[in-house]
Curated annotation (Swiss-Prot):
Expressed predominantly in the kidney. The gene is CLCNKA. It comes from Oryctolagus cuniculus (Rabbit). Residues 507-687 are cytoplasmic. This is Chloride channel protein ClC-Ka. Disulfide bonds: none annotated.
Length: 687
């Protein structure tokens, strides 16, 4: 029953709900409502986006800090248990392995039972969404809890599994951004806008990185490089504003909790500012970049191959389909057993956390020179003042432990990436790169113990600077991004190695991008997610191939004057999601697009008229309310493959019709583009 409506006394005749008249204090409530409307208008005069973006940054900072706060205590509890359980090797081994195995099993089982979209990094799927593909339920807020709980359990394993949180945090941030975007449309009464939604998603991705590393600048640039091929300058301020709010709040919480005296960088370094490196060292930094580029190609190939193997192998694929927690437990058992400190873990600094790994690798002292004449002890517990002692072994030396660490973490990280649970893979890659740089820096410090003479001034070589460059170069090569150089500077708060680090990153990217797809693109390929192959920089002569060579010519058109029986015949004989609407069967002039679902619904409503024997055509259905979409963009048969590819990337298109003098002559979608690019990159053998 509709609510009765009356007239307010003394009013001009505008109707008012009787509930408002009969409610208590009607004038007071009207005044409060009017005041709120006035406040809303004043606040939103500067743009409502500011408030939602600030809310996004603050929320993600609170979540990130709360997760770090809780996980720090869980990890300390594990270390306490391992330390206090006694001298029995069996008990110590069980305390070291059972703890992460239980957490990983729960993480995999819980997250996968709630939603299958919560596993993995999340960035490959987000990249697919931002390219125009709709992945149902992937950004639903119900996935948020599963991702948070699963990620917390993953991170609680510490450095045993050697996994991070960048990717999942980007996914979490984007989910909140999508939710806030829906709240925004309801608050201001605006219709949903696809482009506006994408703007919020891009800002959310930047906030995810910024609230992990407290690095707003590199957070925005990293997300632009990794997730989109084209980026609107208009979105820059949204990303930077939200990322700055998130990073500021994240570091401010550390000050409030008395962890820091003021807002500082996450990883403190002490590189000399006057002469941080000698000019001849530039060559070794570029060499380091080349080494990282080659190593990244090997890693990307092995990781993609092994991930594909787990999906094609009958035993593993069956295990993954029926019991993901069991596979996760088996993999975690292998990884935890290897890192057991009294065993193999002694030679790879397994007692250090991932944060302590970076803190020690960025140390500017040469460990090889410090241990040349003396052997530091291996204490029962890591010494906070001498954490680098964990990297030393009398027989292996510094070089042996660093090399062994790299070899073991190389394949252990590949194995960890196959575990179906929420986990990030950027920070482990960053640490591996730092170890590569540290190894080269230690070798140079031994080869040149007095430093490299340049202009009569002798300056000792700092392996920490090479570790910084290696971290940026290897992570940048794996992800095909340059912004990792800026991330390294924001993490350490120093920019004295700006040029050598950037040169190392460029050298590594030059090799990696010419040989292998990025980590995220490779994952998209293995998971068989919809994606548009990239062609920029590839010598495939895409300018010489035109649309006429690869377009789909067989298209089912619907003419305005077509009889309904003919329309029904087309619908039953094809399964297209949309159909091109032409002026007439003879002219084939493209005038619009009609969606299949809406056309079927209109035909079902028209069924009684058709049963009465009335002769009706498609034009009558369209005039009766069946909506059509205008054709805003088409391709010409003479358009090159390169131009068509750029249009699809720039506008996030899924398909376009091809017209010649207004006539619909073909159709191009991702499928046709992918086949055309594949034919150029892998041409068929000549007969």
């Amino acid at each position: 029953m509709e609510e009765l409506v009356g007239l307010r006394e003394g009013s001009s005749g505008n109707p008012v709900a009787l509930r408002e008249l009969w409610g208590p204090c009607p004038r007071l409530r009207r005044g409060i409502r009017g005041g709120l409307e006035w406040l809303k208008q004043k606040l939103f005069r500067v743009g409502e986006d500011w408030y939602f973006l600030m809310t996004l940054g603050v929320l993600m900072a609170l979540i990130s800090y709360a997760m770090n706060f809780a996980l720090g205590r869980v990890v300390r509890a594990h270390k306490w248990l391992y330390r206090e359980i006694g001298d029995s090797h069996l008990l110590r081994y069980l305390s070291w392995t059972v703890y992460p195995v239980a957490l990983v099993s729960f993480s995999s089982g819980f997250s996968q039972s709630i939603t299958p979209f919560s596993g993995g990094s999340g960035i490959p799927e987000l990249k697919t969404i931002l390219s125009g593909v709709v992945l149902e339920n992937y950004l639903d807020i119900k996935n948020f809890g599963a991702k948070v709980v699963g990620l917390s359990c993953t991170l609680a394993t510490g450095s045993t599994l050697f996994l991070g949180k960048v990717g999942p945090f980007v996914h979490l941030s984007v989910m909140i951004a999508a939710y806030l975007g829906r709240v925004r449309t309801k608050t201001i009464g605006e219709a949903e806008n696809k482009s506006k939604q994408n703007e919020m998603l891009v800002a959310g991705a930047a906030v995810g990185v910024a609230t992990v590393f407290a690095a707003p600048f590199s957070g925005v640039l990293f997300c632009i490089e990794v997730m989109s091929s084209h980026f609107s300058v208009w979105d820059y301020w949204r990303g930077f504003f939200a990322a700055t709010c998130g990073a500021f709040m994240f570091r401010l919480l550390a000050v409030f909790n008395s962890e820091q005296e003021t807002i500082t960088s996450l990883y403190k370094t002490s590189f000399p500012v006057d002469v941080p490196f000698d000019l001849p060292e530039i060559f070794f930094f570029v060499l380091l970049g080349a080494i990282c580029g080659v190593a990244s190609c090997a890693y990307l190939y092995c990781q993609r191959t092994f991930l594909a193997f787990t999906k094609t192998n009958k035993l593993i694929s069956k295990l993954m389909a029926t019991s993901k927690p069991l596979y996760a437990a088996l993999a975690a058992t292998v990884l935890a057993s290897i890192t057991y400190p009294p065993g193999v873990g002694r030679f790879m600094a397994s007692r250090l956390s991932m944060r302590e790994h970076l803190d020690t690798l960025f140390d500017n002292h040469s460990w090889a020179l410090l241990t040349r004449n003396s052997s530091p002890p291996w204490p029962a517990e890591p010494d906070p003042q001498h954490l680098w002692w964990e990297w030393y072994h009398p027989r292996f030396t510094i070089f042996g432990t660093l090399a062994f660490f790299l070899v073991m973490k190389f394949w252990m990280l590949i194995l960890a990436t196959t575990i179906p649970m929420p986990a990030g893979y950027f920070l482990p890659i960053f640490i591996i790169g730092a170890a590569i740089g540290r190894l080269l820096g230690e070798a140079l410090s031994v080869a040149f113990p007095e430093g490299i003479v340049a202009g009569g001034v002798i300056n000792p070589i700092m392996p920490g600077g090479y570790a910084l460059a290696g971290a940026a170069a290897f992570s940048g090569a794996v992800t095909h991004s340059i912004s990792t150089a800026l991330l390294a500077f924001e993490l350490t708060g120093q920019i004295v190695h700006a040029l050598p680090v950037l040169m190392a990153v460029l050298a590594a990217n030059a090799i990696a991008q010419s040989c292998q797809p990025s980590f995220y693109d490779g994952t998209i390929m293995v998971k068989k997610l919809p994606y548009l192959p990239w062609i920029r920089g590839r010598p495939i002569n895409s300018h010489r191939v035109i649309v006429e060579h690869f377009m789909r010519r067989a298209i089912s058109t619907l003419a305005r004057d077509a009889a309904l029986e003919q329309v029904v015949k087309v619908l039953t004989s094809t399964d297209e999601a949309e159909y091109p609407l032409v002026e007439s069967t003879e002219s084939q002039l493209l005038v619009g697009i009609v969606q299949r679902a809406q056309l079927v619904q209109a035909l079902q409503a028209e069924a009684p008229a058709r049963a009465s024997g009335q002769q009706r055509c498609l034009q009558d259905i369209l005039a009766g309310g069946c909506p059509t979409e205008p054709v805003t963009l088409t391709l010409s048969p003479e358009t090159s493959l390169h131009q068509a590819h750029n249009l699809f990337e720039l506008l996030n298109l899924r398909s376009l019709y091809v017209t010649s003098k207004g006539r619909a002559v073909g159709y191009v979608s991702w499928v046709e583009l992918e086949k055309a690019i594949s034919a150029l990159t892998n041409p068929p053998p000549a007969k």
